[in-house]
Swiss-Prot record:
Biased composition (Low complexity): 456-466
One GO cellular component, as annotated: membrane
Protein name per its UniProtKB record: Telomere length regulation protein TEL2 homolog
UniProt entry keywords in alphabetical sequence: Chromosome, Cytoplasm, Membrane, Nucleus, Telomere
Family according to the record: Belongs to the TEL2 family.
Record's keyword annotation contains Cytoplasm: yes
UniProt keyword Nuclease present: no
Compositionally biased region (Acidic residues): 482-493
Listed Polar residues bias regions: 629-641
Region ranges (Disordered): 446-493, 620-641
Biased composition (Basic and acidic residues): 467-480
Species this chain originates from: Xenopus tropicalis
Role, per record: Regulator of the DNA damage response (DDR). Part of the TTT complex that is required to stabilize protein levels of the phosphatidylinositol 3-kinase-related protein kinase (PIKK) family proteins. Promotes assembly, stabilizes and maintains the activity of TORC complexes, which regulate cell growth and survival in response to nutrient and hormonal signals. May be involved in telomere length regulation.
Length: 829
């Protein structure tokens, strides 16, 4: 009998010359006999030699020959025979030949046939056979690692290869959303083969299956693969210890370079800590890479993870005694990071929220003995961390620090009073507090909460029995009979007293100087009445206010908080704004000078900034009390009212106006446009005094005094001042002084552009936008072209590299605004 190599060589030579369909069929059948699948199959030794040495060259020859000449000879039966070479031989070699042929072949009959065969190859589940074959080969003494790497690359990126080859003619089977779930099913089949082999006492290797999982996840397809793989593994490991060991080995064998995407996907997919513990086992203790990912990187850096994933990770650490020491270690590291001043200052808010969530989840999972061992760390972190968060200029960060500090103090001393802060609760604060309870406790509470209304519903109340309802009807009839005999007032409508106010014994002062005396006194009732009417009185008596404007502003700025006076802070702010609007030059000079003076609290300095911005806005608006003579406003002067109190017969009548009104009322109009009164022009009062508000405030910011350091610890006030300067700049639109103010503000921004506080940087970016909106583009490019170019470069850098989301957004807005202004100028030469 001729050797296999000779037979194969002769068959290939004949096939290359055949032009008859029947001879082609006979030649193919003679080659197929070596596959060992037909009736006339060759001996086992010959089949093994053919598969090892000749199978791949034969497939490559068949792919090369398929074309217009062979297509005329191949009927449907012969095409099926051609396909069987790929579908019935060694799957790993057939898969590689098909994938390589697709990459080398352009649009042609050959490409269509290869795609068709590959589609059938996947539909019959041959991927599982490919993976299993490679797993078996890895048990050999000299596995072909290069071949395995090639198969691994083709399996993990098959949708990308097919999309590049077929482009718009791609098949739905090759789409990622369809392929990777099918691949997950193939991996489950391979694991089932491993389970069966282990039960038969055979050796197995699943490292190649682990490599497939790792590489697919590394390419960003965790969701498609693990959404099928994790639920199937969850159901299998719960009932079988062999499956549990297979699952653990599957994840242990994932290469370290691909471990991160695999663990991240499993953490996000696994529904709870119990499932995660069943899938991973003690992998976090055995594998250093896994321990680093689960206890450091995911908890400190990957702040895109949701709170459910964090609860799964930390709950997984707490579910077994061999892992609980890692939970205590994580708590100490979280406390150190949370209390770090550098972290609070330089980290974005989402990352701080992420660390705070992890910290509170840890606290909720520790028992009393573990918390007792960490009490000193808790105390040190509380004392240093609370201060750093309270010093933050970002309100959300301050509020978050308050919540965590309250929880830490409660765990340090459960029986003591603990810390308590005043803050407005929002969704984040409520979520943080809820994290102290493990997930199963939260679910129980919510379930009870849902059940309570059902238990107390009217349908299940004892009052719904027929006897009780009958008794209640009799009682109602008796009550109605007794009430009918009485002369009651039940039908009277009660008087509406919702708008009533409490009568005050003290009257509101009529003069400004009287108000000053009341403000300096200790009479709380008079003070309340005076504060309620002070702003209105200032607006009505402008001349008298200007005489004592500085004294009044000084008293209002220094007056102590009066909790007994309703809306005291709001009324004081309104009065300060009113006196500043009445005498803007004098009061603004006083306030800006006092802003940098000694012995003022941060609250007073921020009050000054609020008053300056509110007063500037009021000055830039049209005065509400200025109306035209035709507006029909009522004169409230009592003398004028008495002098004009004529009888109806003495009132002079404008007969022309009466006639026009009668004609208008009798006239029927089918269409009438909107009649709008022509606005009365009025000067912008702020433009004339803008410099008195702006320049004194901007010139002394770098001067350090004993109790006030804007460039140091008082960055919250610096941020508020920067925003105030931006508001003052924005209100100078169309003002002659706008260019001068804009140049000074750009220089100010350039000095502070590298400030570490995100709130300050947000204010600086806001100032740039106000300069662009207030100063004409022509003046910007002529008077301060160099500053504008430097500012544009800085905006681009911030938009690309800044750690704060709001800063990046404001920088992009500034760049878009700058580009829009430039295009408007170029479009209108």
């Amino acid at each position: 009998m001729a050797p296999v190599s000779t037979v194969v060589k002769n068959a290939i030579s004949d096939l290359a010359k055949i032009s008859d369909g029947e001879r082609l069929r006979e030649a193919l059948l003679s080659l197929k006999s070596y596959l060992g699948t037909g009736e006339n199959s060759a001996q086992t030794q010959e089949t093994t030699e053919f598969n090892r040495n000749h199978y791949t060259p034969v497939l490559e020859f068949l792919v090369a020959q398929i074309g217009p000449q062979w297509l005329d000879l191949l009927t449907s039966e012969r095409l099926e025979l051609w396909d069987s070479f790929f579908l019935e031989g060694p799957p790993d070699q057939a898969f590689l030949v098909l994938m390589d042929s697709l990459g080398k072949t352009g649009p042609s009959i050959r490409l269509d046939r290869c795609v068709h065969v590959l589609e059938r190859f996947l539909q019959r589940g041959a991927l599982a056979e490919v993976i299993w074959e490679v797993c078996q080969q890895q048990l050999e003494s000299n596995p072909t690692s290069v071949l395995h790497e090639a198969i691994l690359g083709r399996i993990s990126s098959l949708p990308d290869h097919l999309a590049n080859c077929l482009q718009q003619h791609n098949k739905p089977l090759f789409y990622p959303k369809n392929y990777y779930p099918r691949l997950a099913g193939s991996i489950i089949r391979v694991l089932q083969m491993v389970s069966d082999a282990l039960r038969d006492g055979k050796n197995c290797s699943i490292s190649f299956a682990s490599q497939v999982v790792g590489k697919v996840c590394m390419q960003g397809r965790q969701k498609e693969l693990l959404s099928v793989l994790v639920p199937r593994l969850k159901s299998l490991v719960q009932s079988d210890c062999i499956w549990q060991r297979i699952c653990w080995r599957l994840l242990e064998s994932v290469p370290d370079r691909w471990m991160e995407p695999v663990l991240t996907g499993i953490v996000q997919t696994a529904p709870g800590a119990e499932v995660l513990s069943q899938l991973l086992g003690d992998l976090v203790v055995k594998n250093k890479r896994t321990q680093f990912l689960l206890t450091k990187k995911m908890l400190f850096l990957q702040y895109g993870l949701k709170k459910d994933a964090l609860q799964s990770i930390l709950g997984y650490l707490s579910l077994d005694a061999s892992r609980r020491h890692l939970l205590v270690k994580v708590l100490r590291e979280l406390l150190e990071v949370w209390s770090s001043g550098s972290v609070v200052k330089h980290s974005p808010h989402p990352q701080l929220l992420h660390v705070s969530r992890c910290l509170l989840i840890c606290l909720g999972l520790l028992n009393k003995q573990e918390i007792e061992s960490c009490k000193q760390d808790l105390l040190v972190s509380l004392t240093s961390g609370a201060r750093n968060y309270l010093d933050s200029s970002v309100p959300t960060t301050r509020r978050m620090g308050m919540v965590v500090a309250e929880c830490l103090s409660h765990h340090i001393d459960t029986e003591g009073p603990g810390l308590s802060f005043q803050y407005e609760e929002d969704e984040d604060t409520r979520d943080l507090k809820a994290l102290l309870k493990p997930p199963h406790m939260v679910e129980t509470d919510s379930a009870d909460f849902v059940k309570r209304p059902v238990e107390s519903s009217p349908s299940k109340s004892p009052l719904s029995s027929p006897e009780v309802r009958e008794k209640s009807k009799v009682k109602v009839k008796a009550d109605q009979a007794s009430d009918s005999d009485l002369d009651s007032d039940d039908d009277l409508v009660p008087y509406d007293m919702s708008a009533d106010t409490e009568l005050k014994k003290s009257k509101a002062p009529a003069y400004i100087r009287d108000c000053i005396e009341v403000l300096l006194s200790d009479d709380v009732e008079k003070l309340e009445v005076t504060m309620a009417s002070l702003a209105t009185l200032i607006q009505a008596n402008t001349l008298a206010t200007k005489e004592v404007s500085m004294e009044l502003a000084k008293i209002l700025l220094h007056i102590d908080e009066k909790p007994s006076v309703a809306r005291f802070t709001e009324l004081r702010h309104a009065a300060l704004v009113a006196v500043t609007v009445t005498d803007p030059v004098t009061v603004s000079q006083y306030l800006t000078s006092e802003f940098y003076s000694l012995n003022y609290s941060l609250r007073q300095r921020m009050d000054i900034l609020d008053v300056l911005s509110s007063a500037a806005q009021s000055l830039s608006e049209k005065p509400s009390h200025e109306t035209s003579a035709e507006s029909g406003s009522v004169n409230t002067d009592p003398h004028s009212i008495r002098s004009t109190a004529w009888t109806s017969s003495e009132v002079p009548v404008n007969w022309r106006k009466v006639v026009e009104e009668r004609i208008a009322s009798k006239t029927r109009r089918f269409a009438k446009g909107h009649s709008a009164a022509t606005p009365v022009p009025a000067p912008n009062r702020y433009h004339a005094v803008a410099g008195h508000f702006f320049f004194p405030l901007i010139q002394n910011y770098d001067r350090q005094i004993v109790t006030f350091d804007l460039l140091g610890e008082d960055r919250l006030v610096l941020g508020r001042m920067v925003h105030t300067l931006g508001i003052l700049m924005h209100l100078t639109l169309n003002a002659p002084i706008a260019s001068q103010m804009g140049k000074a503000l750009l220089e100010f921004v350039w000095v502070l552009r590298s400030h570490t506080d995100a709130f300050v940087r947000q204010g600086l970016l806001f100032c740039i936008s106000t300069v662009l909106l207030s100063v004409p583009w022509e003046h910007l490019m002529t008077d301060m072209a160099e500053e504008v170019v430097e500012t544009q470069c800085w905006l681009a850098e911030v938009a690309e590299r800044d750690s704060d989301d709001d800063c990046r957004r404001l920088a992009l807005n500034g760049l878009f605004l700058m580009e829009k202004l430039r295009s408007n100028i170029q479009g209108n030469p």
